[in-house]
Amino acid sequence: MTETSYRTGPDEKGLFGRFGGQYVAETLMPLILDLAEEYERAKVDPAFLEELAYFQRDYVGRPSPLYFAERLTEHCGGAKIYLKREELNHTGAHKINNCIGQILLARRMGKQRIIAETGAGMHGVATATVAARFGLQCVIYMGTTDIDRQQANVFRMKLLGAEVIPVTAGTGTLKDAMNEALRDWVTNVETTFYLIGTVAGPHPYPAMVRDFQAVIGKETREQLIEKEGRLPDSLVACIGGGSNAMGLFHPFLDEPGVKIVGVEAAGHGIETGKHAASLNGGVPGVLHGNRTFLLQDADGQIIDAHSISAGLDYPGIGPEHAWLHDIGRVEYSSITDHEALQAFHTCCRLEGIIPALESSHALAEVFKRAPRLPKDHLMVVNLSGRGDKDMQTVMHHMQEKLEKHA
């Protein structure tokens, strides 16, 4: 353990260094403070923790396996690659870890109505799932662009009893869906619980979502010690808002021997401006209730993000990631659409696992790094979700490629 802990944040104001905070409408402030207090009580309440553990085990299907990717390891010819199989969770991604935690909190607070934003649709599906399980009304905000590319997930949400509200504003993606959800929350503050899907938003959301996702890193630690007798040498995860990454990273932040790498979406390339890499191509600003790195123009207006992956298509990043970038504890790189698609195909062909396009960004980074590392280097990559939802996108890109070469 290091003498200075990287795991004590945020402070009482919800700040991680100069990032985070509570930039919300006055009407929301009492609710935000109430939520923060309720969460502080819940996280030390044995009954709450016992119920959370029960649902993680028997409903979500945890622990998720830590799998030695033998053929990917052979393919790279260097580091030993392990996959943390979050795509095997109920609903097919890491999102359910957070949704179970927050729905138990919503029920504890007596809320009858759940709202959420979604990009790739996985958080929407997970929210609709837990709302159905606990008999609560559910409204999901989703941008029209994302609805077009994630029709299967839209149908799943409706099947689970949720109302899906299309958002036409802006580019019709995650940022716009989050704006609408925040407007709804201000209007229906008494009855409604806003179930945010990532480590962004006003305090206490970044810390709360991280805590519910930290089960990923805690399990990884135990599982790798059991398999290899030691901690990993490096961790790799993709980043949109950054909840799957923070869930893997947080339990290891105070281990100086563990290198940590977050992977943003470079889209068509950082230099083109068509990307979603807030740390590699953005500047600090305020969005959705917190101060963090954002994609902005010279006038401070939010620039639309681009990624082939709907779940990474966000012009900001969780404030704790912004702080970890600032202090240099975590290295943040970026991967293009093309590189992610190549990694997607490689994983399918070599391991018989169809990863989400989000997770494929992390895999692409692994394929760059692993060949340069010694064979005894233990590398864990978070396979945050499965790729069923991305078939339409991948088919479209393969078709384009075939037509180009015809």
Curated annotation (Swiss-Prot):
Keywords, alphabetical: Amino-acid biosynthesis, Aromatic amino acid biosynthesis, Lyase, Pyridoxal phosphate, Tryptophan biosynthesis
Gene3D superfamilies tied to this protein: 3.40.50.1100
Domain of life of the organism encoding this protein: Bacteria
Pfam families: PALP
Catalytic activity: (1S,2R)-1-C-(indol-3-yl)glycerol 3-phosphate + L-serine = D-glyceraldehyde 3-phosphate + L-tryptophan + H2O
Keyword Magnesium set for record: no
PROSITE patterns in the cross-refs: TRP_SYNTHASE_BETA
Name this polypeptide is given: Tryptophan synthase beta chain
